[in-house]
Design a protein with these regions (language model features):
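N-proximal helix/coil linker or "cap" segments that precede and/or mark the start of modular domains
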Residues: 4-37
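A short beta-strand-turn-helix
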Residues: 29-32, 38-57
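Short active-site neighborhood of thiol/selenol oxidoreductases, capturing the structured segment around
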Residues: 51-72
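Structural microenvironment flanking redox-active thiols in thiol-disulfide oxidoreductases
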Residues: 67-112, 121-124
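Structural micro-motif
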Residues: 112-114, 132-143
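Thiol-/selenol-based redox modules, centered on thioredoxin-like
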Residues: 138-176
Length: 176
C-alpha cells in the first residue's frame, strides 16, 4: 500500500511539473562549456567528427525517431531554413538512436539534405544529457555550438514547429 502511494505521488509530481522536468538539468552540458566530442555515422555511412566543424557554427539537434510526426516537422523546418544557416556558416546535425538505414530512408522520403547521425548505442545522446525518460530514444534537445566548440545556447524539450526560427534568431543575436 505504501509503495503504491509513493508511486502515485511520484507520478502526480511528474505530471504537474511537465515533461521538461523529466530531464535532469545537471546531465545537460551547460552554456559556456566545451561541447562533448563525438564521431558518428551519417545517413551515407560516413564518419562525422564534431572536430571537423571547428571554424563554423553547429546546430546539434537530438530528436526521438525518424519518420514520426514531430520529428518530421522539425526536420522539414531545418531543411526549409538551411540556406539561412549556411549563409551564417552554420551546419545542422540531427542525432537520434535510429540506424543509418533508417536515416537514409527518412532523408530520401522527406528530401532532407543535411546530415542525420546514428547513435544506436546512445553514447552521444547520453553525453549531451538527451536520453528521454520515456523510453530508449533521444529527447528533443538542441545545442548551438560556436566555431570554437563552445556550447552557446541550450534548448531542452523543444516544440518542433517554431524551433528552427528560434535557433536562427539566437544565432543572429550571438553573431553580433
Amino acid at each position: 500500500m505504501k509503495q503504491t502511494l509513493n508511486i502515485a505521488v511520484a507520478a502526480l509530481a511528474v505530471c504537474l511539473a511537465g515533461p521538461a522536468s523529466l530531464l535532469r538539468a545537471a546531465d545537460v552540458p551547460a552554456e559556456g562549456s566545451t561541447a562533448p566530442e563525438f564521431k558518428l555515422q551519417s545517413q551515407e555511412g560516413k564518419t562525422v567528427d564534431l572536430k571537423d566543424f571547428r571554424g563554423q557554427w553547429v546546430v546539434l539537434y537530438f530528436y526521438p525517431k525518424d519518420m514520426t510526426q514531430g520529428c518530421t516537422i522539425e526536420a522539414h523546418n531545418f531543411q526549409r531554413d538551411l540556406a539561412q544557416y549556411q549563409a551564417k556558416k552554420a551546419a545542422i546535425l540531427g542525432v537520434s538512436a535510429d540506424t543509418t538505414d533508417s536515416h537514409q530512408q527518412f532523408c530520401t522520403k522527406e528530401s532532407l539534405t543535411f546530415k542525420l547521425l546514428a547513435d544506436p548505442d546512445k553514447n552521444v545522446i547520453n553525453a549531451y544529457g538527451s536520453l528521454s525518460p520515456r523510453g530508449p530514444v533521444a529527447a528533443r534537445n538542441t545545442f548551438l555550438i560556436d566555431p570554437k566548440g563552445v556550447i552557446r545556447k541550450v534548448y531542452v524539450g523543444v516544440k518542433p514547429d517554431p524551433h528552427s526560427a528560434e535557433v536562427l534568431a539566437a544565432l543572429a543575436e550571438l553573431e553580433k
